């Protein structure tokens, strides 16, 4: 993965974190230190692991861990959607079409998470190809 692609991945991850934090601020108060915190930590971990993978010479194990943490982030967001937390506005269920609001928010995050996942998989494939050339 080239330097330009890595910068794009950083940028995409930062956009995801901003959007996640915007939506997570509306979760119910009883989830502030539960699922909400798990999602935030997973997003921050993914961002930190991206930086770590960019700096390491041997990237394969870091990229593998990064891929796992990315899947955990995807799973946590899915759990929040299934529990109906994306339908909340200001810690209360939205009065105007909470299901529609939840679906729009989940779709927005899903698209962003999927795009980052495709970029990570491309990076993993490029790194695997690079390592097989060296051997």
Spans of features found by a protein language model:
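Amphipathic alpha-helical assembly/interaction segments
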Residues: 1-135
